[in-house]
Amino acid sequence: MSKKKILLLSDDLRMYSGIATQSKEFVMGTIHKYDWVQIGGAVNHPEAGKIMDMSEAVKNDYKVNDAYLKIYPTSGYGNPESLRQIMEIEKPDAIMHFTDPRFWIWLYNMEHELRQNTPIIYYNIWDDIPDPLYNTHFYRSSDMLMSISKQTYGINKRILSKYNYEDWQLDYVPHGITDKRIFKIKDKGDTKFKEFEQKYKLDQHKFKILYLNRNIRRKSPGDVALAYKHMMDKLTPKQREECVFVFHSAPSDENGTDMRAVCQTLLPDYPVIFTHDHGGHMNDEEMNFLYNSCDVYINMASNEGFGLGSCEALHAGTPIVVNVTGGLQDQCGFKNEKGEYLTAEDYVELQSNHRGTYTNHGEWVKPVFPTNLSLAGSPLTPYIFDDRCSFEDAGEALLEWYKIGAKERKRCGELGRQFVLNEGKMTAKHMSESFIKNIDATFENWKPREKYTLEVV
């Protein structure tokens, strides 16, 4: 029996954005089941207008003899004309799109035309409440919505419950990490690992705090630096010699700040490693080395859809400090009064745990609850909460991780690793299995839109 073909609209899966890496994970994890075509977006894509047939490479790398993968690179995220042309050539059985809905308004304007013959699937996320009712028509333009966070699942279900969406049309499918990229290194005496630590001066410190996020305002890089300072201020001079703040991001970004200036001015006496000074971009092996070398990962983002960095850190067995917002909540292992992990269904009523409704959490995380919820917005997204936690609270969390020592951090990190591998279902295998389940459910249950009838009056 021939395989169904899926047309994916997202970042080019050969790129390095979070959208791209996750696109690659679920495409490669399901390519034995489906044929894939991608309209691969990028800013000023260098291969725009070409057709890249990746089938043979996938057959060799993934040992799938009937693999089919073609990428149509494009600058931006495509347009109606190119979509119609590619659909005429490839004749896909379903369309899947992935990333912020505002990039797909042109697609939603075509939804009735497309859904007469082809179902639309949306792998979606939203950073925070209140429920974005301004997204209602975007959500209604899809036949199946897979939610990347439990908070997003609650949003999708509350909004779409008014429009007779059935259970099969909504599901919680968190991002998944493959152990081919990120895993716990058991032998840290390995020569390559040691050489990596020496190259980045990581071998000179015993307690390394990792910031691995974009240098943009909502990621709060300055607050992370102040949290580090808060911790260091409470240590003795001897203890401070063991510690370092590792900044793996662009040191300066117009969408964020100049972190060199921040650190030189506000914490001039405390060591900071800017990884870009020692080599810049890292490949998959080096990224895994970085996660394994550091002792704690921190994310204080005020809005965070999922938080790939903290999830990858847990896969390496590295404990975390995170702001309780968006998808970061799902990595905390919050439990209810019965000691049961919160489910996606719980979030239909809960909405968000950013107010600390539940405080029982996994040992692998020091969650920092927001001290201020500010209503932000823009003309296209009129309202969304901005969850700000204090750098003092985050600094206290870092201090706790320092004080418990390396042996206890290792134990807690391993508990976190087991959580994301099992109950959290944040592996590439779990994600791919969920994709297959939901795509098959779409093909089984989808009903085409009725065609328009034009009558002469």
Outline where the language-model segments fall:
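C-terminal amphipathic helix plus adjacent low-complexity
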Residues: 359-457
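Conserved donor-binding/catalytic core segment of Leloir-type glycosyltransferases
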Residues: 8, 202-219, 228, 245
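Nucleotide-activated donor-binding/catalytic signature segment of Leloir-type glycosyltransferases, i.e.
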Residues: 256-285, 289
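Aromatic "clamp/platform" in nucleotide-sugar-dependent glycosyltransferases that forms part
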Residues: 302
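Short hydrophobic beta-strand element within catalytic cores of glycosyltransferases
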Residues: 319-322, 339-346
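N-terminal subdomain of nucleotide-sugar transferases
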Residues: 1-56, 90, 457
